[in-house]
C-alpha cells in the first residue's frame, strides 16, 4: 500500500505541488496498490489497541480498501482538486529505485477480527484533500 499524510514528501503532496504550478503529470509506473491515509491507519491503531490480547500476538495488514494504479491515483488527485492538469503515461524507465508492481495488502483478517469497515481509498483521499483546503 502507499501511505500518505499532510506531511510533505509523499505521492499526494508531490502531485499537488506539480498541479499547483500548472504542470502536467507524467507517470511511468505500472504499479498497483492501495493508497492509504496515515490518519486512517493511526485511528485504526488507537481503536484496536484496547482490544488486543497481550498474550497472543498477531500480525495484521491495513490499507484503505480498493486497488488502483499510480496513474489512476494521480488522476483522482487531479479530479478531486479540480485541476486542469493532465496525467500522461510515460513508458520511459525511471532512474529511481525499482518498486514492486503489486503492493496491495489483504485486509480481510484485520477487518474480520476487529469487525471494522475499512474506508475506500477514494473516499479517504477526498476527505484528506478537503481537509487540506
What are these model-derived regions, one by one?
Residues 1-33, 38-47:
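NAD(P)-dependent short-chain dehydrogenase/reductase
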Residues 11-13, 38, 42, 70, ...:
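A general structural signal for well-ordered alpha-helical segments in protein cores
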Residues 19-23, 49-53, 81, 114, ...:
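A general structural signal marking secondary-structure boundaries and capping sites
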Residues 26-32, 60-67, 113:
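Glycine-rich Rossmann NAD(P)(H)-binding loop
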Residues 33-36, 68, 105, 116-119:
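Residue-level signal for the nucleotide or nucleotide-sugar donor/cofactor binding architecture
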Residues 44, 51-96, 101:
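Mid/C-terminal beta-alpha module of Rossmann-like enzyme folds, strongest
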Residues 121-133:
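Amphipathic terminal alpha-helices
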Amino acid at each position: 500500500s502507499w501511505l500518505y499524510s499532510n506531511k510533505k514528501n509523499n505521492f499526494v503532496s508531490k502531485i499537488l505541488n506539480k498541479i499547483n504550478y500548472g504542470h502536467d503529470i507524467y507517470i511511468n509506473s505500472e504499479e498497483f496498490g492501495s493508497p492509504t491515509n496515515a490518519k486512517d491507519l493511526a485511528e485504526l491503531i488507537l481503536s484496536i489497541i484496547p482490544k488486543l490480547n497481550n498474550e497472543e500476538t498477531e500480525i495484521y495488514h491495513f490499507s484503505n480498501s480498493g486497488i488502483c494504479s499510480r496513474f489512476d491515483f494521480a488522476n483522482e488527485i487531479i479530479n478531486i482538486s479540480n485541476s486542469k492538469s493532465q496525467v500522461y503515461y510515460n513508458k520511459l524507465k525511471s532512474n529511481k529505485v525499482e518498486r514492486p508492481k503489486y503492493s496491495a495488502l489483504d485486509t480481510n483478517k484485520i477487518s474480520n477480527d476487529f469487525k471494522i469497515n475499512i474506508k475506500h481509498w477514494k473516499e479517504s483521499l477526498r476527505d484528506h484533500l478537503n481537509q487540506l483546503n
